[in-house]
Structures are given as C-alpha cells and as structure tokens.
C-alpha cells in the first residue's frame, strides 16, 4: 500500500456497543492488523443530549473484551488527539471560518418552521426528495450583518457545487456515482455551534491521517457530502468500504427495537459467551474466507483477511450459529476458565452460595466439567444442571416411557443393591456396579443404561452417567431408585 494504513472506528457514547458497531470495528481492526497498520477509536460525543452515562467507557471496554486492542483513543494517546469530538470544537471552527472566507459556506437564518414549510411545498409539487432552496445563499454581506445584529440564530451551510458528479471507488461495491443536483446546500454547523457529522468526520479523518474507512452501508449516501468538503480543502479522501446491512432471520434490517435478538455485546458477555467466539463470529458476518472452515483464531483471521472477499449481500445474524460456534470454543476451553465463566451463574441463580467451602467448590467444578460438551454459553449451566439441585426427581415423558418397560424393575433393583454397598461412591465404582448389573440381568445397551438414567435424573439424555450419579450423591441416588421402583409408570 502506498501510504501507512490508519483506520478509524468512531462510536457515539449514546449507548453501548451494538453488534453492528462491533462488526464494523472488527473489520477495521482486521484490515489494519493485516497490513501492519494502526486502528484509532474516536469518540463522536457531540450529540450531548443523547449521551448516556458510562457510554464511552462501555464502548471501549467491550471493544477490548472482544480482543480489538486499538492503538489510539482517549485512553491511548498517539499524537493525533484530542480523540473526543467535543474537545475538537476549536479545530472545526478554524476550518468552518476558512470555508466562510472562501465563499464555500454561508450563514442560514431560516427557522425550522420555514424549512418545514419549504419541504411541504416541494412535496406538494411532486418532489419526492425535498432539498433546501438556497434562499440564504443569496443574502448580501449587509443583510447577514443586520440579521446577526438582531441576534437571529443561524446554521452554517455548505454551498453544493453545481453540475458535478462525485464518484466513489468503493472497496465493496465498486464504482458508485452521485450527482450534486440531488443534494441541497447542507448544514455543516448547527444553530448551537456544534458541527454536523458529515463535516466533522472529514476534518477528523484528514487530521488523523485515516487512509481507509470501513463503515455501514447506511453511510454511503453521506459520502458525496464528505467528498465536497475534501474537494474544497484540496485534501485526498480515504478509500471507502461500505459494509452490507446486518439482517435478522426474516431477512429484515436489524432494528435495535427487535427484542427477538440480543443486540449488545455486553449482554453476550453477561450470558457467558466467549470473546474469541464472538470475534470469530463477527468476522464471518459479511466476509467469507476461502474453503469451508469456520473456526479461526484471531491471528488466523488477521493473516487471511482479504477485502476482496467482503460480501455485497446482506449478512444474516444467525443466533443459532453463534451459539453453535460458542459451544465449539467451550468444548476446547481450559477447565479453570470454564469454571470462571459458568460458576458465577450458578451463584447468581441461588444454586450455590457465594462463600463456598473447598468441598462445594470442587463439586461445582466437577459439575461444570460434566457439562463442558453440552454447554453453549456460561449461563446455560443453570438449566442444564437443574436436576442436581432438585429434592424430587421430575420425570420427562420419554423417561416415563422407558421406566414402564418390563425389564426395568430387575435392572433398578439390582443396581440399587450395588449402590447401597458402594464405598467409595466414585464414577469408577459406579461403572463397575453397572457392569455387574449387566451380568446379573442379561440386559445391555439402552435396555440397561436408559432405566438407570431415567430413574436417577428423570431424563433420557444427559451427561456421562457414572459421573452424574457420583455428583448426585449416594443418598439422593438411593432415594430416586427406590421411588422409581415404587411408582407406577
């Protein structure tokens, strides 16, 4: 690449890190790391009324949790700051003044009511996309001075060049063109003195030497406005890549109001999803590697990331696939880390005390290990392991059908006799007892294992049986076997 790669991700602290923002940040990060470049996180905090307390910190913490270790931001000065837009207002003012002096921008005194009336008139005349008429563009310097002297509030608008075609050579979509006639003179500074997004982002990207901009496709229509600012200042714009929409399983654009999908990174973190699984999943949301493999480490993704493989079609956020992928990572997880992930959920659900004894902690560790293959996320340990915390066994319908089979009393009676004598009560001893029951009754396979599982767990599927029996404890297993022998199924 001709110049150093510097990419930027610019969240607003108006909320927490959304899955759409996380995906955008991730592609910026992968591109920068693939090319040995830098990633900058700039905080776009000029929408002061909508900023939420802790929003900025939450955005940064969740990026870092995902494994997006950016190079520059409010907490990592790289010499291109300030990194908050509210701390850059004097910088923007300088460039606004320059445009005013050169006649490329002007003060607009039209009230919101006048502007709305203008839009309504244009709609009534059959204009589908109303735009500003340019009324204040024609004010003389004397008229401007008089209106200012009267204390009339004003915005500042950019003069849109006439008869120009703007071309974007987009890294995802190829060549996209826009005509200046379709864009009215637009506001670069609001009446409160705060610059608008389309103006401030150009100043920031230029001064921070951003070389490539990866962002959502909803920003594509903003690009010609930004190119006008680059042109007026004689600056070279960065290369743009507009990422496809993320859609739900009904192929509709993801809406933050859609409660059928968990949409914030912090929520996945709280549920016990793994950052490396989320990183992997987001990387495949609008980008595809060569071949069929879907599980990649962060380093592998950095190495193979290729812009030419970014998708032009909407990307479906498939929660089932994310859960499957997280399970693949959990299966290979170090047990200490899995305990760290799952144990707090058992405590939070009231299944275990916060101040556990060493014996309780070891039991919990063994329980979590028992479900490592099945667990899709940390919080799932609570419903998965419910049978271990119930006083009375609850039989599923399938378990009742199994327990109604004719060989069951013989199997359970023989197993109960062995259980009473078992000491120590360990998985190995339990395995030996089941083998002895097989020999004594002649039953094997499902006819042997299913009745025992159904009697002690109330289920026909579950974790490895001897270990589950060991964790239930001798007394509870005896009680459950006795009940199954007495009950009519």
UniProtKB/Swiss-Prot annotation:
The answer to keyword Translocase applying to this record is no
| Cellular compartment(s) | Cytoplasm
Query: Which Pfam families would you find in this protein's record?
Result: Anticodon_2, tRNA-synt_1c
Family membership noted in the UniProt record: Belongs to the class-I aminoacyl-tRNA synthetase family. Glutamate--tRNA ligase type 1 subfamily.
Q: What is its main location?
A: cytoplasm
Sorted alphabetically, the Gene Ontology cellular component annotations on this record are: cytosol
Q: Which Gene3D superfamilies match?
A: 1.10.10.350, HUPs
The record describes its quaternary structure and partners as: Monomer.
Catalysed reaction, written as an equation: tRNA(Glu) + L-glutamate + ATP = L-glutamyl-tRNA(Glu) + AMP + diphosphate
Source organism of the structure: Geobacillus stearothermophilus
Q: Which residues bind ATP?
A: 256
* SUPFAM superfamilies per UniProt: An anticodon-binding domain of class I aminoacyl-tRNA synthetases, Nucleotidylyl transferase
According to the UniProt entry, where does the motif 'HIGH' region sit in this chain? 11-21
What is this protein called in UniProt?
Glutamate--tRNA ligase
Query: Where along the sequence does the record place the motif called 'KMSKS' region?
Result: 253-257
Q: What's the EC number here?
A: 6.1.1.17
What keywords sit in the KW lines? Answer: Aminoacyl-tRNA synthetase, ATP-binding, Cytoplasm, Ligase, Nucleotide-binding, Protein biosynthesis
Functionally, this protein is described as follows: Catalyzes the attachment of glutamate to tRNA(Glu) in a two-step reaction: glutamate is first activated by ATP to form Glu-AMP and then transferred to the acceptor end of tRNA(Glu).
One of the entry's Gene Ontology molecular-function terms is: glutamate-tRNA ligase activity
Write down the superkingdom of origin.
Bacteria
